[in-house]
Curated annotation (Swiss-Prot):
Transmembrane segments: none annotated. Keywords: Isoprene biosynthesis, Nucleotidyltransferase, Transferase. It catalyses: 2-C-methyl-D-erythritol 4-phosphate + CTP + H(+) = 4-CDP-2-C-methyl-D-erythritol + diphosphate. Pathway: Isoprenoid biosynthesis; isopentenyl diphosphate biosynthesis via DXP pathway; isopentenyl diphosphate from 1-deoxy-D-xylulose 5-phosphate: step 2/6. Belongs to the IspD/TarI cytidylyltransferase family. IspD subfamily. The record marks R23, K30 as: Transition state stabilizer. The gene is ispD. One of its GO terms (molecular function) is 2-C-methyl-D-erythritol 4-phosphate cytidylyltransferase activity. This is 2-C-methyl-D-erythritol 4-phosphate cytidylyltransferase. GO terms for biological process: isopentenyl diphosphate biosynthetic process, methylerythritol 4-phosphate pathway. Pfam families: IspD. InterPro entries: IspD, IspD/TarI, IspD/TarI_cytidylyltransf_bact, Nucleotide-diphossugar_trans.
Length: 238
């Protein structure tokens, strides 16, 4: 599959925020849980809206969402809201469908619950367009010893970590191509866990861009406290 190396085109950040985050055990969707002085999603959106290279931010929310309008970021002129779907891929596709046909934009897809993203990581991912015109993702090399579990919960084997990476977000792809491959993968019934998996299914292999360890996803209650510590540390170094 041929790609023309180009760093042109607008940058559109997409935030799928229609999920409920059941593992947090909270009464509200996890993206609206308080983190320091504001909800998690507000931190995430602020990091994207304040980046000078990002032209537009599209947030996909649930039809039942009664929290989004209370965010100050919801009124930013760079932000557009769309209705998301049941799964992450459905929400990303809804956001991509809000873009004009035949646009040359790049889609920068970022988890709603990753509030510690830095501008430096965004810069590194955007710079990778010349090296990886097919797209790339932020990721981290696996540092720990990895084990594969047997069905009874015991260790089956140790997995070589040499070529393993933790996939992070943002994930950056030409918007039209990502939309095409997401539609095709969903129509084929493929399980899509992130945008890169849809591209891989289509025979497109994204680049890996090393990201920061503090770009964590708030998934469990303990993550909330850790994210707060990371945000405070980042603020002290700015």
């Amino acid at each position: 599959m041929n790609f023309q190396s180009s760093s042109s085109g607008s940058i559109v950040a997409i935030v799928p925020a229609a999920g409920i985050g059941s593992r947090m055990g909270a009464t509200i969707p996890k993206q609206y849980l308080p983190l320091l002085d504001k909800p998690i999603l507000a931190h995430t959106l602020q990091r994207l809206l304040s980046h000078p290279a990002i032209d537009k931010v599209i947030v996909a929310v649930s039809a039942e969402d009664s929290w989004f309008d209370s965010l100050a970021e919801a009124r930013d002129p760079k932000l557009t809201r769309v209705l998301g779907g049941k799964e992450r891929a459905d929400s990303v596709l809804a956001a991509l469908s809000a873009l004009p046909d035949s646009c040359d934009a790049w889609a920068l897809v970022h988890d709603a619950a990753r509030p510690c993203l830095t501008h430096g990581d965004i810069d590194a991912l955007l710079a990778s367009r010349l090296t990886y015109p097919q797209g790339a993702i932020l990721a981290m090399p696996v540092r720990d010893t990895m084990k594969r579990a047997a069905t009874d919960g015991s260790i089956e084997t140790t997995v070589c970590r040499e070529a393993l990476w933790h996939a992070l977000t943002p994930q950056l792809f030409p918007a039209e191509r990502l939309k095409q491959h997401l539609e095709q993968a969903l129509a084929a019934g493929v399980s899509i866990t992130d945008e890169a998996s849809a591209m891989e299914w289509a025979g497109v292999y994204p680049g890996l861009v090393s990201g920061r360890a503090d770009n964590i996803k708030v998934t469990h209650p303990d993550d909330l406290q850790l994210a707060g510590l990371f945000l405070q540390a980042q603020q002290q170094h700015t």
